[in-house]
Amino acid sequence: MPAQVIAEQTTFHSVHDTIMEETNTTLYPKRLEGKVAIITGGAHGIGKATVMLFARHGATVVIADVDNVAGSSLAKSLSSHKTSPMVAFISCDVSVEADVENLVNVTVARYGRLDILFNNAGVLGDQKKHKSILDFDADEFDHVMRVNVRGVGLGMKHGARAMIKRGFKGCIISTASVAGVMGGMGPHAYTASKHAIVGLTKNAACELGKYGIRVNCISPFGVATSMLVNAWRKTSGGDVEDDDVEEMEEFVRSLANLKGETLRANDIAEAALYLASDESKYVNGHNLVVDGGVTTARNCVGL
């Protein structure tokens, strides 16, 4: 190859690399700069990962959780960094309407706006009480639906009211599950609740689109969060141990269609970041499935 061509190609790649570096660090340094976000279930797992990622991208973040100790500690830790935006904690049980209304009202009163509401709080339910439909436990079913579905509905209600009242074209995101896409992926109550979240998302998107409010949800495959690991450990008996996370991840990998990768909480946080940012400005009523293709592959005959 002529030296001139090699030199021109080298120059092109150098310029290209420089442009990409400047794009990443200068033009788009923070994708949520100036925005205010509420993240329920923000003290642990997917919620915690999202709190940290949103804060890193310039958002003012309000952590909402029933775990006051973990929530307060996380907020204090993130707010201690000089370059970080404000991160606050508000105690909230998403199944209690007064708590959800207070969460939204305090956030708006304190920061003047609400741009992003991430309905992430949820429960898996008692595995032993939901092992078989023949042993259906109505009280346990009501508990799961109260937190997972009622909590999302209340979040949508009060979050949308605040956005509409102040004319903000915000976005509402909810955590669903692959169990809300197909059967046989989780306990009965949990599966019913996640199907309901997908339905609520689509219906709310149809109604709120006229206000410029986008409503979407995320359906992850198995993520080895404390909730999932605890449920798995309780089913087999005993307390959670340090190596249970790795063991759980290995189990999920064995079921996965996409090999060579491990789904972690930060991957779901990245999906939430996309849906919360202006990059998804025309995405509405969508269930973003983050499962490495498992729900597609399991529906394929003979593959």
UniProtKB/Swiss-Prot annotation:
* Keywords associated with the record: Oxidoreductase
- In this protein, the active site sits at Y190 (proton acceptor)
Residues reported to bind substrate: S177
What InterPro entries does the record tag this protein with?
NAD(P)-bd_dom_sf, SDR_fam
Tell me, what's a Pfam family for it? Answer: adh_short_C2
This enzyme's EC code(s)? 1.1.1.-
* Chain residues that bind NAD(+): 38-62
The GO molecular function terms of this record are: oxidoreductase activity
The family annotation for this protein states:
Belongs to the short-chain dehydrogenases/reductases (SDR) family.
Any idea what this protein is called? Answer: Short-chain dehydrogenase reductase 2a
Native organism? Arabidopsis thaliana (Mouse-ear cress)
